[in-house]
Amino acid sequence: MPSRSALPGEIKTRKFIRALRRLGFAIDMSGGDGSHFKIIWPKTEKSLTIQSKLRKDVLYYTLKEIEEKFGVTWSQISKEL
């Protein structure tokens, strides 16, 4: 897990979603008003709801959750960005 200072200030949501899709996540953007989306790891069917605006503080905790739940690290995600 990188330090907060090592993370980019803000990542575009579409770019982040594209990287997650390349890693094998399924993305569910249906329902609601569009302020959140759900990523699903097909191997375990576990899911995580993510806020659409990925500020640095939100990104840090999101990456922490992704690593704990799915075992996918920031270095793997950043390679796909």
Predicted regions and their residues:
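N-terminal first-folded block
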Residues: 1-31
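C-terminal structural segments of small proteins and small subunits
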Residues: 55-81
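Short alpha-helical interface elements
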Residues: 20, 41-45, 64, 75
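Short, flexible active-site loop motifs that bind/organize anionic cofactors or intermediates
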Residues: 6, 49, 67
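A short, structured beta-strand/loop element
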Residues: 27-61
